[in-house]
A protein has these predicted regions:
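Feature marks short, highly hydrophobic, charge-poor N-terminal signal-anchor/signal peptide-like helices
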Residues: 1-7
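Cytosolic-biased juxtamembrane loops and peripheral soluble domains of multi-pass membrane proteins
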Residues: 24-44, 68-165
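Membrane-embedded alpha-helical segments that form the functional core of polytopic membrane enzymes
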Residues: 8-13, 75-79
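N-terminal signal-anchor/start-transfer transmembrane helix
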Residues: 12-26
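Aromatic-acidic/polar surface patches that form glycan- and anion
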Residues: 6, 22, 47
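Alpha-helical hydrophobic membrane-insertion segments
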Residues: 9-13, 54, 149
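Long, highly hydrophobic alpha-helical transmembrane signal-anchor segments
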Residues: 1, 42-71
Length: 165
C-alpha cells in the first residue's frame, strides 16, 4: 500500500469499525431494554436506515480510497466524535439505533437539555462531514438529501412514540 493511501485507509477503517461497534452496542442495549419491558416503535423503516448508512459507507470506501484527507474537515469530524461520546455517555444503556421506548422518564440532561434529538443532529452533520474529509462533496450532498428524507420518517415515528398526545 502506498504512503498516499494510508490516511484515507485509516479514516475509512475507523468509520467501518465505529459503525460495527455501534451496531453491537445497540444490539446489546436493545435486547436489555426489551427484556425490561420496553417496546419497539417504527421497526418498519429501520431497514431503510440500515440501507442508507451501508450505502453511505460503501460510497466513502469505494470513492474515497487513496484520496487525500482534508485537515479542516477531519478536525470537524473529530469534534463530532466528542458529541457522539457525550450522547452515548448521557444515554448509557438506553442508547440504541432503534426506537425503543421504556416506561421511564425521558433523559433530559447532557445534550438533551438543548436539543430534542442530539443523535440525529450528529448524524446529519456526520453524513455531510465524513465524505468531505476525503473531498467527496457530491457524496455528502446526495446522502444528506437521502438522510433528510429518511429522518423525516424516523423523527415523526420517534416523536409519536415518545410524546403521545
Amino acid at each position: 500500500m502506498s504512503e498516499a493511501v494510508w490516511p484515507s485507509a485509516l479514516f475509512i477503517g475507523f468509520l467501518i469499525v465505529q459503525r460495527l461497534a455501534e451496531l453491537a452496542l445497540a444490539r446489546r442495549n436493545t435486547a436489555r431494554l426489551l427484556a425490561r419491558g420496553a417496546v419497539e416503535h417504527g421497526a418498519a423503516h429501520y431497514p431503510l436506515i440500515v440501507a442508507l448508512h451501508a450505502s453511505w459507507l460503501a460510497a466513502i470506501a469505494l470513492l474515497g480510497w487513496g484520496e487525500p484527507v482534508r485537515p479542516f474537515w477531519l478536525a470537524i469530524f473529530v469534534l463530532l466524535q466528542a458529541l457522539r461520546l457525550w450522547i452515548l455517555g448521557t444515554l448509557g444503556p438506553r442508547w440504541t439505533t432503534r426506537i425503543i421506548v421504556l416506561d421511564e422518564p425521558l433523559v433530559r440532561r447532557g445534550p438533551f437539555r438543548v436539543l430534542r434529538h442530539p443523535n440525529y443532529t450528529l448524524v446529519v452533520a456526520e453524513i455531510a462531514v465524513a465524505p468531505l474529509v476525503l473531498g467527496l462533496g457530491w457524496v455528502a450532498l446526495v446522502f444528506s438529501a437521502l438522510n433528510a428524507a429518511v429522518l423525516g420518517i424516523r423523527i415523526r415515528s420517534e416523536n409519536a412514540a415518545l410524546y403521545p398526545r
